[in-house]
């Protein structure tokens, strides 16, 4: 139960930070940002926006989180990430705190 609460808190934190980043963008979203939302496909994130998100998350959690492990797969950058994928990554990194 505690793990579920922690995971939900991480998801809400990621959503809050993403919403803060896109608040001035003129997005016509069909649905609210959720764990199923993809950064590039749904929110039109650029690579710079993804870097800003990573920095904001590191500042929020007050530690380096080695996002290169999430952003690269088989030596290539991933094409897109969902809020859920980011949250799962964060949960695995924060377990050792």
Predicted regions and their residues:
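Phosphopantetheine-dependent thiolation modules in NRPS/PKS and related acyl-activating systems
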Residues: 2-45, 49-55, 59, 63-97
């Amino acid at each position: 139960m505690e793990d579920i609460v922690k995971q939900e808190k991480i998801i809400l934190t990621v959503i809050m930070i993403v919403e803060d980043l896109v608040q001035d963008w003129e997005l016509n979203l069909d649905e609210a940002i959720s764990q199923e939302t993809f950064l590039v496909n749904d929110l039109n994130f650029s690579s710079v926006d993804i870097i800003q998100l990573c920095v904001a998350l590191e500042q929020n959690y007050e530690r380096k989180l080695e996002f290169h492990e999430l952003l690269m797969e088989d030596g290539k950058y991933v094409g897109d990430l969902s809020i859920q994928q980011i949250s799962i990554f964060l949960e695995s990194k924060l377990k050792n705190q």
